[in-house]
Amino acid sequence: MQIILLEKVVNLGNLGDIVKVKDGYARNFLIPQRMAKRATPAAMAEFEARRAELEKLAAEKLAAAQAVADKMNGTVVTVARKAGMDGRLFGSVGNADIADALKAAGYVVDKSAVRMPEGPLKAIGEFPLDVALHTDVLANITVAIVAE
């Protein structure tokens, strides 16, 4: 299916690109999330008429995400969990726990934005993580896990 991207999509393209994707990806994800439209002649004409407005919105989103990232960089978030004598946690600290801790610190972040390449954290200590605030903006934070 041919679609017009209404915003930047990772590994697919930028605003205004016309790309071919599988039908299910377009119908079930891109179109409902308002990231894309079908590439019909009418939709293309409408997009070209609104291109400047959409580019302005995309630039505003990027600027807002960059401002939040500037404030968030270097933030240390502390999470308390029960742990054994050897420093291993009873359970783990995942994306949702870190998103809740960031919310308590005054940052509104979706749990899917927290990047944990090694998976959930299962030990006491300090761990550097990235938070994806926008497709082009990453904030670096440190998660400190302490024993209760």
Curated annotation (Swiss-Prot):
InterPro entries: Ribosomal_bL9 (IPR000244), Ribosomal_bL9/RNase_H1_N (IPR009027), Ribosomal_bL9_bac/chp (IPR020594), Ribosomal_bL9_C (IPR020069), Ribosomal_bL9_C_sf (IPR036791), Ribosomal_bL9_N (IPR020070), Ribosomal_bL9_N_sf (IPR036935). GO terms for biological process: translation. GO terms for cellular component: ribonucleoprotein complex; ribosome. Keywords: Ribonucleoprotein, Ribosomal protein, RNA-binding, rRNA-binding. GO terms for molecular function: rRNA binding; structural constituent of ribosome. It holds the Pfam family Ribosomal_L9_N. Binds to the 23S rRNA. PANTHER family: 50S RIBOSOMAL PROTEIN L9. Belongs to the bacterial ribosomal protein bL9 family. This is Large ribosomal subunit protein bL9. The lineage of its organism: Bacteria, Pseudomonadati, Pseudomonadota, Betaproteobacteria, Rhodocyclales.
